[in-house]
Amino acid sequence: MGHKKPTETTRSYLENAPLPNHGKTYTVVTHKEVIDNTLTLLKKSGFTVQREIYRANTNATIAQGIYHIYPSRSVDEDIINETELGMMFAWTNSYNKLVRFQCAIGAYVKVCYNGMVAGDMMNFKRKHTGTANLDCSINIADQVKNAEKYYKRIIKDRDAMKTINLTEREQAELVGRMFVQEELIDSQQTSIIKAELAKPSFHYGTDAESCWTFYNHVTHALKKAHPRYWLQDSQNFHDFIVAECLNTSKPTIKTETILSEKVVVISEPVEKVIEVDEDITDTQLIENVFLDQ
């Protein structure tokens, strides 16, 4: 936030951007290496790349690649029959030390190209030191290997959002919290969300008070985010909505106490529940311990 807004660019522009010279301890992970490794691994893993989107700041010191992909070899009926969401792979890379390499499998809404990234999917961020080149390639492969599992989790979250209604006031309160408390959106994005609430640019198949509609108003605004922030902002927003609207593991118990003919509503959260992701792989555990996260 506070940076010059990015522009879409070409693959050739990123591949030919000047390389940095930050000393012997800095390992350059070139945009070209990331692009080549991504496209090669996607093809070998049975994914068809339907669209490539590249964005960058001035001089391409921070770059981003977004790929709309289709799992050509999938035999999963839920994935084969999904028509609203497409699968997405995205990465962010830099030459100026402002952001570590990061990548994630996610989804995009076909009607508007809004992106979706869930928090536990973006499990790798690598400094440009030592064996960064190899480590980045390994992580791209790990994300691609688990693509269908991650994609189905997003589909499940989408379905849950469609069952939840948010009043106009509740939506306004969420926007205010995202701007003031969470710092997930900036003033321009807040204005975009306000405009979308009044007059949506797209129809998302749900009514104005649907959590799914609200989610898309925000992800539409997040498309204005700088490449340095877009993946992280998308992840944080998804986590925010899951915690505030979808997470039923922490229900609120409301009790009424009558005092002097007045009703006092006391809200007390129940005891916290710690959830363990049993699908964590050995690769992810090793990355968390040894790759300076």
Functional labels for PLM-detected ranges:
Residues 71-293:
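Intrinsically disordered, low-complexity regions enriched in serine/threonine
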Residues 1-62:
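N-terminal low-complexity, intrinsically disordered segments
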Residues 58-74:
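Charged, often glycine-rich, active-site loop that binds/positions anionic groups
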